[in-house]
Amino acid sequence: MRYRYNEVNLHTHSYYCRHGKGEIVDYVNVAKAKGLLKVLGFSEHAPLPDRTLDYGTRMAYSELDDYERDVKRADGRGGIKVLLGAECDWIEDEAGYYRDELLGERGY
């Protein structure tokens, strides 16, 4: 399916990354009310398993399951496709985690 550029937002942060506000469903409800978006992608700052580089802007590793659940529950609400993603800083020592867990096991 093709969308116009203004029908898609793939860089959205909720309260999970500490500098966003509101729950995922809140963003979907606002998008529906405004009637502009067809696709809304969440890209919370990816947690690191050992909490390195945690400056208060990442979700906690323990929140990954809740984050995934909230995105999946919101998908399709109001006719909006909701996508699960993560904003990752490239850290060479974490390449295996990004590849195996976020991309592989969790399917980001």
For each predicted feature, which ranges?
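An N-terminally biased module of ancient metal coordination in phosphate/nucleic-acid-related enzymes
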Residues: 1-92, 97, 103
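Active-site-proximal loop/helix segment associated with metal-binding centers of metalloenzymes
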Residues: 108
